[in-house]
Each structure stands twice: as structure tokens, then as C-alpha cells.
Amino acid sequence: MNRKNFIQQSSVAAAGMLWAPAFSFGKNDEVVLGHNNKRYRLDTKWGELDAAKYPVKDCHEMVQDSKGRILLLTNETKNNVIIYDKKGKLIDTWGTTYPGAHGLTLFNENGAEVLFICDNNRHQVIKTTIDGRELLVLDWPKETGMYTKPDEYIPTETAIASNGDIYVADGYGKDFIIQYNYKGEYIRHFGGRGDKDENLLNAHGVCIDYRHKKHPTLIITSRQQNCFKRYTMEGKYIETISLPGAWVCRPVIKGDYLYAAVLQSKNAEWKQSGFVTILDKNNKVISNLAGTAPVYSKGVPEEMYQTEKVFQYPHDVCIDDEENMYIAQWNSGHVYPYKLQPVS
């Protein structure tokens, strides 16, 4: 799905609305979400700031740096990057030139942390220092032979390999994954829109799975197909991880687990029907936050959907060094990120 159609289909339901969860959050209230050993206590106030001074539009993605700080990426050009401490206190902001800021990836490059920002509007991927100094800009991938103009390329996410190779997901364009070396030189492309196993449909996210240390692989979102797909690092298709009913965003791996925001439920499209899903090391769903309890039939999950009106359109999750989870939401009334703390 291209970015223009994606916005048009969803904006009717949510444009301009200020929204709050369908719960009371008084002093003594507590909302616990999830299943099995992945249950969390919800805090909707964690990231709130003075909207006049530090506004957000869409809260797209979040990462934690080595100092323990939480970085939020928004497409609000007054402050594209907002930096919090783990208690939700504002530390710093930067960025005024990323109107389509969408994907945020952190990478440790020879001891220095760098960021990769995907900008939908600029049709570029921008590499920066942790404080916003630009280091590299990747333009539209004409080297692939698959694109005739920048507008056809709408990157949504990156993943960076240990050798510095850059994988860019063109999730709102032609659904290719484009691989570059650390210098930004083109290596190959794969995926692309289609109905074969190796193809993708809304390749919204990508990450590198190091859970099998000797055999890292790529896990790539095929959101409109409600699944992740696994590929070799050279782009060869391996398998599909089916998640019926779940419009999953990027996969985020922490320890043995894979976490993902689910933008919306298939049975309630464009009705603020998102939730969060968690998979174990065998890529089996073990918990859905604000969603159905996971049930498997013949090795595949039964259709999953939102069961509690907590989130609107969750767009990303960030897991910190204490296993807390932070949720960024798209097109959700300019809400700031939520925090969820593990419940034992």
C-alpha cells in the first residue's frame, strides 16, 4: 500500500480527534495487559509534555541508547527527535528538517552510536550522530533499475548488520528491500510487491535476528499479509511467520523475544483497533497486550484482534534495559508515548 492511500483510508476515522483509553486512570486504578509471563502495567501519562512547547504529530518509532535514554521520532518538525529519561522526564530535543520522519534505528558503529532515519516525504534515509549531525544521506535507489523517480520510493525502516551493511525497507513504495554496504554503496535488492512467498506487501519493517548467533537472518514485515517473513542475509526467502488478523509493524527483538506493535486488527480496519503482540524464541505468539489470548490451531494462531480499547494505532515498541516497554502511536490524536512495566 502506498503512503498516500494509506493515509486517505485511515484519516476519515481519526483526523483531528483527541482520544483517551476506555478506562479510568485514577490514583488507585491499575490496568494490566497481556498473557502468560508477559504481562504489563499500563502508564498512559509517562511521556506527556507541554504540547505548545514540544508538540508531536505521529509518534513513529523509539529506541534506547547506551546512556539509558529513550529517543522518540516524530514527524513534527519543531522537534523531530525527543529524548526522555526512563521516568519520562524531557532531556533534549533536536531535528527540524524531517517532515516525513518514520523509521528510527540505532547502531553502534565502532563505539559511537549513530541513528538512521527514514523520511517518507524526502524519499531518503539519513544517517546521523546521536545528537543530530548528518553523516550520510541515501537517496532513491535508481541503481536497482526498479525505480524511475524519487516519488516511487518511500522508505519506512532500516536494519544495520554487524559489518555495517544497511538494509532499507521500501514499505510504502514498491516493497523492495535494498541492501547497501556501510559506505552507502548498492549491493542488491530483493522482495518486491507480489503474491509469491519471496514477495512482500507493505514491507513496513525489518530487523536482524541474532537469536541464532551463528546464523543471523532478516525478519521483514509483510503487514497487509498479516505476517513476518524470514530471509537470509543475502535476501533468500526462508519462511513465513503467520499472524492472522494482525497488521504488524516492525519486529523488535530483545533477548529471546520478538515484540511488535500491531497497527490495527483485520476485523476492524481503520477503527483504532491496535494492540501489541509478543512472540517467543520459536516465533510462537505468547501474549497480546489489549488483544486476544493466543490460541493455536494446526500450528497457526487463530485470528487475533483488539479486545480492550487501550491503544488506537500502535506503531512501534521499545524495550529498555529493565524490560519496560514503550509504545509510540500513529494517527492517534497526538498522544505521547505510553510506558508499560512488567508484572511478575
Model-found features: residue ranges?
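Blade/loop signatures of beta-propeller domains
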Residues: 27-44
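Blade-level signature of beta-propeller repeat domains, shared across WD40, Kelch, NHL, RCC1
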Residues: 313-344
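Blade-loop segments of beta-propeller domains
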Residues: 79-82, 86-109
